[in-house]
């Protein structure tokens, strides 16, 4: 068994089937899951740190810490439901979100990461919620899909739209009709030599 197969076996859920959508590379699929688990752990940890800011009477940092911890628990619930085996409905919730398109998860993670940063801008909220934001960005990139092949991009670039003439590819295609070339060999005939 190769190292990649061991890693994918550790990060795969029991009875998990491959998604029906466009195939993603294994390192992106499981790397995003691993990033989400790490992000959730640090969001909970730094959210707890922000909650302790009540000592300095900063209510906004207290609220930001609570929101960051909730976001960390939600991300952990969706990425690693095995951490919440004591709750019966966790697998159903994770499967429901798993069946949604990837851009749904990306939007959810990005939306959960922004309020703690706005409420209490500091290293703890920036790092904890920033990792969740990064996980959302990775899922957003996966939702966009991979780039088309070179042949497909060339074919799309050569298509004509609305009956226009095909694109000209010679060197003088962008020059205005009847334009005279510049000449630096002598003075222009209308120059007054002033």
Swiss-Prot record:
| A Pfam family matched in the record | Cg6151-P
Q: What is this protein called?
A: Calcium channel flower
Q: How does it sit in the membrane?
A: Multi-pass membrane protein
Chief localisation class:
membrane
Q: What GO biological process, any one, is recorded here?
A: clathrin-dependent synaptic vesicle endocytosis
Name the residues annotated as site: Calcium ion selectivity.
79
How is this protein's activity controlled? Channel activity is inhibited by La(3+), which reduces Ca(2+) influx and thus inhibits it's function in promoting activity-dependent bulk endocytosis (ADBE) in response to high stimuli.
């Amino acid at each position: 068994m190769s190292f990649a197969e061991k890693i994918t076996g550790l990060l795969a859920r029991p009875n998990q089937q491959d998604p029906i959508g466009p195939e993603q590379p294994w390192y992106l699929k499981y790397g995003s899951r691993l990033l989400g688990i790490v992000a959730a752990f640090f969001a909970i940890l730094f959210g707890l740190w922000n909650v302790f800011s009540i000592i300095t009477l900063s209510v906004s940092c207290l609220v930001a810490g609570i929101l960051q911890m909730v976001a960390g628990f939600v991300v952990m619930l969706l990425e690693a439901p095995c951490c919440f085996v004591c709750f019966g409905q966790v697998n159903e919730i994770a499967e429901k979100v798993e069946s949604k398109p990837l851009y749904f998860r990306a939007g959810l993670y990005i939306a959960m990461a922004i309020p703690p940063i706005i409420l209490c801008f500091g290293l703890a909220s920036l790092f904890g919620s920033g990792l969740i934001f990064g996980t959302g960005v990775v899922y957003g990139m996966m939702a966009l899909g991979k780039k088309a092949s070179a042949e497909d991009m060339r074919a799309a670039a050569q298509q004509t739209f609305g009956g226009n003439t095909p694109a000209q590819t010679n060197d003088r295609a962008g020059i205005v009709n009847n334009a005279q070339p510049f000449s630096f060999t002598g003075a222009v005939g209308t120059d007054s030599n002033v």
